[in-house]
Amino acid sequence: MDDKFHSACHLEHFAVALIAIVLTWLIVLGFLFSLSFLNPVERAFENFRMTDIFYDAENQEEQKDTSGIITLVDMTDVFNRSRLAEVIEEIDAMDPAIMGIDIVFDGLRDDEVGNERLIETVCNNIHSPVIWAYKLTDWSEEERRFTKAFHSFFVEEYGIDVEEGYTNVQRDVNGGTVRSFGIKRKVQNHFEYSIPARLAVGLTGDSTVLKKYDDCTIRYTATVFPTIPFDSIAQNADLIRGHVVLLGATSDKRDLHYTPLGHIAGVKILAYTVQTIVNREIPREFPKWMTMFFTFIFIWIAELFQAGLTSRMKKSRFWIFHKVGEYDLVAEVVAIIYIVLLVGFDYYFFVNTNIYFNTAWTIMGVALLETSCKIYALLRDAYNVQHNKKNNKQ
C-alpha cells in the first residue's frame, strides 16, 4: 500500500503541478503588467466571474421566490412633478416601512405649480421615513474620490434638509457589468452613504454594514420583486404596508444596466442590493493566498488522476482502452469531468455559504497540464543529458 501511495504521489507529478501553477502565475503577472499579447485573455477574465454562472443557474429555475420585504413602484411614464408628488403621498398613505425615491429632481422647471407641489410634499405631507436619491459627481483620479454631489432642486435651491443616499451605479472597469454597489464614499472630508445602505439600515436599525464595508457585492438571487404601476397603489396596499418601497423607472431603456442576469433597470439593482444587505448575504471570495494554495492542490490532484488513468489504460489488455491511453484522450476527458465536478462543488458551497472559490485559475492550471508535462519532460531530458556527460568524463 505504501509503495502504491508513493508511486501515485511521485515527485514528477508534484513537479508537473508546480510547473502548471507557475505558468498560471506568469499569465496573471502578464495581466498585471498589461502585456499586449495577453490583452484578449485579460479582457475575457476581467469580465468573467464564476458567480455569473451560479446566478444564471439559480435564475433558470421555474420556481422563484417573491420578495416579502421589497416592492417596486413604476413611474416610467410619469413626468409631471405634481403627479409624482401625489404618487409619493399615496405610497406614504399605505404605511410603508421606508421609502426610497430613485429620482433626482434636477433644477427648477417652468412648471411652478409642480415645483411648489413637490416642495409641499417633501416638507409637510410625508410621515413615513424617506430616502431621496442624489448623484456623486466630479471624480478625482488623483485623490481617488468624488469631489461634488448633485441633489434635487429642493435641496440645491432651497436647502431643505432631507435624508439622502447616492445612486451611482458601479461597473467593472472594462466589462461594464454591475456586480457590486457602493456602501459609502468619501466626499470632501466626510462619508456619503448610498440609498440601498440607508434603506437597509432604516429597515433593520443595524448600522454595522456602514462601518464594515465600502462596497457590497450584490447577491443576484432568483427573486421576483412585486412591481406596482403608479396608478394602482391603493389596490396593492398589502404589497406596500411594512415593506421597503422603491419608486423609480422599471422599464426606462435609458436606465438599463448590464448585470450577470442581463440588462435590468437601475431601481431593480437597488432592490437586489437592499435585499443582499438586509439578508446578510453579501458574497465573499476566498482570500488570495488560500485560493492559490487550493489551486495548486486541485491541479496536483488532477495530474495524479490523469497520469494514473492514462498509465492504466496503456497497460490494458483491451485494444480500445490501450489505444485511448496512447492518444492521451483519457487526460482530456478526466480534465473535463474534473472541472465540471469542481465547478459543481463551488456552486453548492456558494449557495449554502455565500463564499466562492475562484475556480478560473484552477481551470487554467488544469488546461495547462499537458503543456506542463512536456516542459517537465524537456527539463528532465536536459538534466539527464548533462548528468550522463559528467559521468562519462569521470
What name fits each language-model region?
Residues 311-394:
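Alpha-helical transmembrane segments forming the membrane-embedded cores
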Residues 202-236:
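Substrate-access "cap/lid" subdomains that shape
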